[in-house]
Every structure is written in C-alpha cells, then in structure tokens.
C-alpha cells in the first residue's frame, strides 16, 4: 500500500500526510490504510478548490487558466493541510473580515461566494452514515458538510452541492480511479474495511512566493496548479501510454517519443524577402517635439490651443516638398493635406476666439487620404443569395518580410533615459488591498527607475493619442476632425512642459462594432532623413517642411525638418487597449517584484532596499549574439518595461501565435538545461507552428532573432 500511495499521489500530498502521521505518533509503515486515506482527503480538498474563481462582479466562474489572471480571486480558501497555527490564523482572519461564526473544529475550506466554511468528507462506507457522524461531531449549522464516496455517491447539507456537476464529476472520477487502482493491486478490500472515521491533517508543506508562482505559470494548459500536474505526472506511465492513446484516436496517428538532446533543436527560420517596415500607429525614436515650458497661455490644456502655441515656437517653416514618396499613394494629396492643415490653423489664429475643436474642410485630398467612399457598397445578403457565382473577393497572402536592424535600434532607444519625467509617483496607482510599507517602497523605487525612460514617454503618448481619437470618433462621427498629438511632462528641474508631435486628421467614424475601423491620416515631425533607411518608411510619404537650428558641440547647426505622413486605421477595441497602456508599468513592476521575492526568499528577509540600492550588482537582461547581456537593476526595469510597451504598440495575431508556440520550445529547452531529460514528439510540427507566425511583423521577427540567440547560448 505504501508504494501505491507514493505512486498514486503527488509528492507534496505524500509529504503532508507523512508529517501529519508523525505528529500523531503513528507509523505509516504499519498504518498504511490511514496514510492512503489522509492523502485522498487532501487531494479531494485541493480538487474542490481548483479552477473556481470570483470575477470583478463578484460572480463565481470556472476558469482553467493557461496563465493566472491577476484580476480573479480564488473562490475557496484552503485551510486543510496548513500547519495548525497558520490554519487558525486564516480562520480567525476570515471570521473577522466576513463576520462568519468561528467554528469549533478546523474546517477544510472557506467558500467566499456562499460565505461559509466547508467540511469535506471522503468515505469508504455509506455516505449518509458518514454524514451523520460528521454532523454530530461538528454540531454547527453554519459549517456546510459535503461527503464523497468511492462509489460515486455524494451527500451535502440541504442537498446544496456548492459546485457545478462537472467539477464534482472530476472528483468522483478521481476517487473511482483510486479505487480501481487499489483493486487491481489487491489493496481495496483491506482499505475499505479499515475505515474508523474521518482523518484530517493540519500540517502542510508549502511552496510559496516566487517559486510557487513560477511553478503555477509554467504548466501545460488545463492544469490549474502544480499539485494537479504533479499528481498527473506521478501516475503517468509514458512507455506506450501516449502511443496507445493516439492510436485509439486515429489509425493514421503514431507518435514516437524522441529524446530531446543538446543537438536536437535547430534555429528558428526567419523569412526571406524585402526588409520589414515600421507599422506602429505613431513614430517612436524618430519623432520630434515642438515644446513649450511652463505653459500659462489662455486656454492652456485645450489641445488645439496648446498645439497652436507649440507651432508658434518654430520659425523655420518652408515650402513643403516630397523627399520620399509613398510607393502606391497619390503623393501630391499628402502634400496638399499638410498645406491644408497649415492654412486652417492660420485661419483659426485670425479668429477672435479660438474654437475648442477644429473640423477640416472635406477637400478631395483628405477624402482620398481618408478613404472616403472607397469601401465597397454593402448589399443585403437576401438580395443576392441567388446569384450563382457569388463569392467573397480574394485577399492576397501577406508578402514575407525579412528581419531588419531598425527594430533592434527602436527597442534599444526605448530602454534609454530621456531628460524629462513622464510619470508622477502615483501613476501606477494605489494597491487594491491596504498598502503595506514594502509594496509602496517597491513602487517608489521602480517609478524612480522608469519615470525618465523613453518607453514611458511612449506610454503617455499612446494613452493621449488613443483617448483623443476615441473621443473624437464618438463625438464627431461624420467630421474630419483635426487632433493634435500632444504629451505632457516635467523637466529635470520640475517645470511643466507641453509637447506637440504632429497632427492626426480623423475620417468618418460610425463605429458600431469593436472591430469597425476608423481611418486617420497622421502627420508627424521628425529630424530623421527617410532616405537613410527607405525600407523602414515604406508606408509613409515624407515631406521636407522646414529647417531647424540644433544646438550641438560645435555650436548651432541647421538640420532639415521632415513630416512623416501616412494613412492608417484603428478600431474601438485597439483604442481601448491603447488608452490602458499604463498597464505596462504594472506588468513590468510585477516582474521586478518576482525577482525581489526570489532574492528575499534566499536571504530570508526583504531585499527591496538592497536590490535597488546596490549599484555594483548586475543582472541578466537578455540574450544577444554576444551572449547574455547584463546591466544595472535600473536597466532591467527599463528593459522589461520596453518589452511590455512594444507588446502593446506592435500587438498582432503574429505576436500572439509566436509567443504561445515559442514558449513550448522554451520550456523544453529549459527542461533540458535542468537535466530533466525531456522527450518530444512531432518537434517538426512545433517548429512549423512557430514559423508560420513569422510573416512580416518587425517586433515578432526581433523576438525570433532573440530566441535564436537564446538557443545558441542555452545549448552550449
């Protein structure tokens, strides 16, 4: 029986059971049936809790998460398996916060949905006999009792079974499997006859903190926590099992598990073709700002007023001309659109009172640039369903594009520091829970590291542009509204600053569905000459619009000022996510917190202060062809933030697919590095799944190139 228990239950449950028996002075070598009973009860308690969460609306939902969702709260608190002191602390805390009556005995779970403690029973006898024993022992109407048997029967207080049928079926199936496994080994009769009453356990070994989170995050789909996965793996006989299962599914399928060795993986194949192009909704490292310090003009804070004030700071305007035409567009129309913006801004300035918003005249150039009347006419399906050759028009396959170094330069630039402060200390927001000293200290340290970062500028720029565009799309659906691209920051000395990057003209925006597209023309200032990397600017028509005096080491030099113009589009759902780009700050802060937690658990004290203030220590940042790149903790913060920001700026189905599929290969490689002797089948299929996501997206191609660097160094 002891061997069976060690095979059948995951090691953590076995260890907890061993501790409990030791505490009660019982020898598991002799009391083997009791050992099995304790393990079974523990596992049922864990399964009862698995996958059940409470969402933000307070509703109970079932999620089988591939990634733990930070916004969801676990429906059940597990009390069973904790050490006695901790278990009573949890019970007292629950009673204090919910007003629940304190139970006389330690219960197994607490249900936050129904606000009640739950006692779980697992019996080899009749469920009603066992239920009565439990009820007599507890003598409390407030504690809910739920009994399961090995025959698939169950009984619960007032026939209220708490969980949905599927969740209960999972528990019953597991109990039935345990019974069958025991029977096949000739252990069941002895186990069935040995029951003397419910066994409970109040000692528990816990993996906590970062290691627990990393363990729970690194599971295959459909496993909610490491215990379930361990239980599955422990009871798993790989030899022939997978092959057998697959052959049941289809005669054509056969899977041989091949060992995964250092020589097995090959680099991911990046596509050939012309270099990839810039596809972000606004310019990043190439943008240029016209700025005013300490703004105090009339109407300060109204975008149009701010924009006109910023435009007045520049005196080098000249007759615009096209220096890099757009390959397919009517370039004179882009030129005329910019001239129209200048003229209409001029008209505003001559008015007595500047209006709060400006709707552009619907000229032929703007109609063309915004795709007015270009959409094919929609016809009701009923009117044309009888047409014999009715078909959806063919769409071309996207052209393959090769990796280009400009996207690495963009990323490097995003990690750099600027000379402005882009977020205030409270930008990340208060914690939902009462904030502890450590959490607020971490937040302040992190904010100090990233407040000057260019990626943070991109966040604030993205939030502003998306908010303004969504507002205009709803408030002025038929108008070609002029929207200045503005950001606010502070100088090192703390002076306020308003920046103008350029303008957007919005097209018609009757957005009924989340994915309905609004077209816009963006016109952005820059000092970057597009002729240096013409492939990057494939989608743009670039004008030369002025000369700017730049202070340099050798005095003032005149540089041509360019305007990058392109037609673009976005949707309600994309703008909604763009408005929430501040989440990137939170995501990268949580990643840094995981690192601090890991360090703290090793040193057995909070290491926040040392982590941020020990400037001599370096940390791994990422892989490059040269090897593992290292840098200061500030550099790590900024790199993680830049990654999160680029995931938002370059969000796409290609990125989703690449992230999900390459993660599988990453886990296999990590298992190899940890000497876990991983085996794989259909590795070629995994490579195919990864490589079909590498089409033309610059950010995905950069991630694939990083992944290849990682493979090279990980398998040395």
From Swiss-Prot:
EC number: 3.1.-.-
Any Gene Ontology CC annotation: host cell nucleus
GO terms (BP aspect): cap snatching; DNA-templated transcription; symbiont-mediated suppression of host gene expression; symbiont-mediated suppression of host mRNA transcription via inhibition of RNA polymerase II activity; viral RNA genome replication; viral translational frameshifting
Annotated protein name in UniProt: Polymerase acidic protein
PTM note: Phosphorylated on serines and threonines by host kinases, including human casein kinase II.
Superkingdom field: Viruses
Location in or out of the cell: Host cytoplasm; Host nucleus
Cited InterPro entries: INFV_PA, PA/PA-X, PA/PA-X_sf
Molecular function per GO: endonuclease activity; metal ion binding; RNA binding
Motif annotated as Nuclear localization signal 2 (NLS2), chain positions: 184-247
Binding positions for Mn(2+) 2 per the UniProt entry: 80, 108
């Amino acid at each position: 029986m002891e061997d069976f228990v060690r095979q059948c239950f995951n090691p953590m449950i076995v260890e907890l059971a061993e501790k409990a028996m030791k505490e009660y002075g019982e020898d598991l070598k002799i009391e083997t049936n009791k050992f099995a009973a304790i393990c079974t009860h523990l596992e049922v308690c864990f399964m009862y809790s698995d996958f059940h969460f409470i969402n933000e609306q307070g509703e109970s939902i079932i999620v089988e998460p591939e990634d733990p969702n930070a916004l969801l709260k676990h429906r059940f608190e597990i009390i069973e398996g904790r050490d006695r002191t901790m278990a009573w602390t949890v019970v007292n805390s629950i009673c204090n916060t919910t007003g629940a009556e304190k139970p006389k005995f330690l219960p197994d779970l607490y249900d936050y949905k129904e606000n009640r403690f739950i006692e779980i029973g697992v019996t080899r006898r009749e469920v009603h006999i066992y239920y009565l024993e439990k009820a007599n022992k507890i003598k409390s109407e407030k504690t809910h009792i739920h009994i399961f048997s090995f025959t698939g029967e169950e009984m619960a207080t007032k026939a209220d079974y708490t969980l949905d049928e599927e969740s209960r079926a999972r528990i019953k199936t597991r109990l039935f499997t345990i019974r069958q496994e025991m029977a096949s080994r000739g252990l069941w009769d002895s186990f069935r006859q040995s029951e003397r009453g419910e066994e409970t356990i109040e000692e528990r070994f816990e993996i906590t903190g970062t290691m627990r989170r990393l363990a729970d995050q690194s599971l295959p789909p459909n496993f909610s926590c490491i215990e379930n996965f361990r239980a599955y793996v422990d009871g798993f006989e790989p030899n022939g099992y997978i092959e057998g299962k697959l052959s049941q599914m289809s005669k054509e399928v056969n899977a041989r598990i091949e060992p995964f060795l250092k020589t097995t993986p090959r680099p991911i194949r990046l596509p050939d073709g012309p270099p990839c192009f810039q596809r972000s909704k606004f310019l990043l490292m190439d943008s240029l700002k016209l700025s005013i310090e300490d703004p105090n003009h009339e109407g300060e804070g109204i975008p149009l007023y701010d924009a006109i004030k910023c435009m007045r700071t520049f005196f080098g305007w000249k007759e615009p001309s096209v220096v890099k035409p757009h390959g397919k567009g009517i370039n004179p129309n882009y030129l005329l659109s910019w001239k129209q913006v200048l003229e209409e801004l001029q008209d505003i300035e001559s008015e007595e009172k500047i209006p709060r918003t400006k709707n552009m005249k619907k000229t032929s150039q703007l109609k063309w640039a915004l795709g007015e009347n270009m959409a094919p006419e929609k016809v009701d399906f009923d009117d044309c369903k009888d047409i014999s050759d009715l078909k959806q028009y063919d769409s071309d396959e996207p052209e393959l594009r090769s990796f280009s170094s400009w996207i690495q330069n963009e990323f490097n630039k995003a990690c750099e520091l600027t000379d402005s402060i882009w977020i205030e200390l409270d930008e990340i927001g208060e914690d939902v829970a009462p904030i502890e000293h450590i959490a607020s200290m971490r937040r302040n340290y992190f904010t100090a590291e990233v407040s000057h970062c260019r990626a943070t500028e991109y966040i604030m720029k993205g939030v502003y542009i998306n908010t303004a565009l969504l507002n205009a799309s709803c408030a002025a659906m038929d108008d070609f509204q002029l929207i200045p691209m503005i950001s606010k920051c502070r100088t090192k000395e703390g002076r306020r600053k308003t920046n103008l990057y350029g303008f957007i003209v919005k097209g018609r925006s009757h957005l009924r569905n989340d994915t309905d597209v609004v077209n816009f023309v963006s016109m952005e200032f820059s000092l970057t000459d597009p002729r240096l990397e013409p492939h990057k600017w494939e989608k743009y028509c670039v004008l030369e619009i002025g000369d700017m005096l730049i202070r340099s080491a050798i005095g003032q030099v005149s540089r041509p000022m360019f305007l990058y113009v392109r037609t673009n589009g976005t949707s309600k759902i994309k703008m909604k996510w763009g408005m929430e780009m501040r989440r990137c700050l939170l995501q990268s802060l949580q990643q840094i917190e995981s690192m601090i937690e890991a360090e703290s658990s090793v040193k057995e004290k909070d290491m926040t202060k040392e982590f941020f203030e020990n400037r001599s220590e370096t940390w791994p940042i990422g892989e490059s062809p040269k090897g593992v790149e290292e840098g200061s903790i500030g550099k790590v913060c900024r790199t993680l933030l830049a990654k999160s920001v680029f995931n938002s700026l370059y969000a796409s189905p290609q990125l989703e697919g690449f992230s999900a599929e390459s993660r599988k290969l990453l886990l296999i490689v990590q298992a190899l590095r940890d000497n876990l002797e991983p085996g794989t089948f259909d590795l070629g299929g995994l490579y195919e799944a990864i490589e079909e996501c590498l089409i033309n997206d610059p950010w995905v191609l950069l991630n694939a190139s990083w992944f290849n660097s990682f493979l090279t160094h990980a398998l040395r």
